């Protein structure tokens, strides 16, 4: 989450005329994240999250995201629910941007997830995949393997400003992934961005999964690979196989991996590392002046990629085969 677009009091009041939420009590921008403009909105009826969708989110995909949230919530997943307007719609416009209001979930993120937290995350991800299995909507992954060279091309000449030799590293990894990307794995709705800052905890239990604005149809095991990179490395960069084993074990207890999925995890993890390294690199060079946002260091994910390049067997990552 972040704030790229400011909202005036007058614009907000006019926008809220479409809802039955009462008068505004407070609006506070959220600096975390990098994609959309997000605010904690307090009104006479409660606390909500207001999101203005920025350029990386396709406006045509917004009905998919909001319908998915309704679907998952109806199946018992703790996720935000879109707040309906008086017209029964969930999507409007504010400050020149598409905008929506969703329910606020109580809880805090784990900055340093424990092994037990990784197990809970694995179970929650499996529950998400199973709950979404009968969702009728579909959306292609706009940041899949085919998109990565296009992300890289406009910034390739600047990559070595971040680290010497980075451009060559990226080019070589793209060639490897294009030649070795697994095919014909089980597919379905994935979250595609399930970092620790998108999972809320109350005590020892997960109280909510948030920020579904990269959700799409892709390999289910690719979602696991994204989580592996986001949850199972220590702050200093070392991989924690116990966290990996806890996550994979809890996931597989609800949705067992096929042999092909398990074998593919190392390559999928390399792809996931490159995907987030590239989008962070793009954002590093393109922070709008005055935006309330904290761009994330792309080198964190290049370091993870470097480690993953040494893995020859999924069991080295904690996958149970």
Swiss-Prot record:
Annotated pathway: Amino-acid biosynthesis; L-threonine biosynthesis; L-threonine from L-aspartate: step 4/5
Assigned keywords, A-Z: Amino-acid biosynthesis, ATP-binding, Kinase, Nucleotide-binding, Threonine biosynthesis, Transferase
One GO MF term: ATP binding
Record keyword Transferase present: yes
Gene Ontology BP annotations: threonine biosynthetic process
First-tier enzyme category under EC: transferase
EC number: 2.7.1.39
Record carries keyword ATP-binding: yes
Reaction(s) this enzyme catalyzes, per UniProt: L-homoserine + ATP = O-phospho-L-homoserine + ADP + H(+)
InterPro entries xrefs: Aminoglycoside_PTrfase (IPR002575), Homoserine_kinase_II (IPR005280), Kinase-like_dom_sf (IPR011009), Pseudomonas-type_ThrB (IPR050249)
Pfam family, one: APH
Family annotation (NCBIfam families): PRK05231.1, thrB_alt
Family stated for the protein in its record: Belongs to the pseudomonas-type ThrB family.
HAMAP family the record matches: Homoser_kinase_2
Protein name: Homoserine kinase
Organism per entry: Methylocella silvestris (strain DSM 15510 / CIP 108128 / LMG 27833 / NCIMB 13906 / BL2)
